[in-house]
Amino acid sequence: MVSPATRKSLPKVKAMDFITSTAILPLLFGCLGVFGLFRLLQWVRGKAYLRNAVVVITGATSGLGKECAKVFYAAGAKLVLCGRNGGALEELIRELTASHATKVQTHKPYLVTFDLTDSGAIVAAAAEILQCFGYVDILVNNAGISYRGTIMDTTVDVDKRVMETNYFGPVALTKALLPSMIKRRQGHIVAISSIQGKMSIPFRSAYAASKHATQAFFDCLRAEMEQYEIEVTVISPGYIHTNLSVNAITADGSRYGVMDTTTAQGRSPVEVAQDVLAAVGKKKKDVILADLLPSLAVYLRTLAPGLFFSLMASRARKERKSKNS
């Protein structure tokens, strides 16, 4: 039985429910609308930011660098494509100018050929890059080399070679182009690092070391360049389905020549390039572009280091057993 007091309170309860629901729903939809508008404005600003921007991309002849060239070109950027193979760069330019139907005005790219491990060539290359359009808006440090091997079997020369390509080369090119950006108080430095710049896995020591150094340098650069209004973005992809593992060097410097299973199952470089474009357009500072497990491993390394180290030791044992079987 419902008491008289309860009966009297029922209309009040229903009235309160009605008021609450009618107040919350508009508020909820309003918040969603504001969020959607914010994302739309971000997208529009990103498109405008990239259109007609002078973008330098290293390692543009293959893999992620080549796909980045395609998406930045389609976005209307003025490209300066860099690499060691001039013929491959020319072929890429022909491909870009012949096949891309875009809604924005595009510009014929320039090419600059040089080796990132040659410090003298980098200085000359930077001068040549600046001659193309007179300035640089965005530098995408993408070129790199991977490595497979045990620490004890790896010569120091191999360690140096990986560091020269992945760390010292990009640092030297960045330093060579920074003065022109500082003078204009405008510019954006992008470092394509790796998830292994945030945590390390066995038999990748030289590569992981070079990417940890990359992360540290560009984090410092971001803080120091804030006064000049220069943006710095570090992008850390996980496995990408490219020839990175095939072209990796081994402990003695020879070519690895194997497509690792993890690499073969990695993300499409086309998708990753689109994510890079979006991150640059939104001026993000630090981005992880990896699947769930590698991303979780980054946090596990910090929150539960003992467990992380045990898992890496187990991985090392399994890889050794697999190679010896």
Curated annotation (Swiss-Prot):
**Which intervals lie on the Lumenal side per UniProt?**
39-325
The active site annotation covers Y207 (proton acceptor)
EC main class here is oxidoreductase
One GO CC term of this entry? membrane
A single Gene Ontology molecular function, please? Answer: acylglycerone-phosphate reductase (NADP+) activity
Which species? Homo sapiens (Human)
Membrane: is it a keyword of this entry? yes
Membrane protein topology class: Single-pass type II membrane protein
Please give the name of this protein: Dehydrogenase/reductase SDR family member 7B
CDD domains in the record: 11beta-HSD1_like_SDR_c (cd05332)
Q: What is its EC number?
A: 1.1.-.-
- Any idea which positions bind NAD(+)? S62, L64, Y207, K211, T242
**Keyword match Membrane:** yes
Residues bound to substrate are S194
Tell me which parts of the chain lie in the Cytoplasmic compartment: 1-17
Where does this one sit in the cell? Endoplasmic reticulum membrane
The record's similarity note reads: Belongs to the short-chain dehydrogenases/reductases (SDR) family.
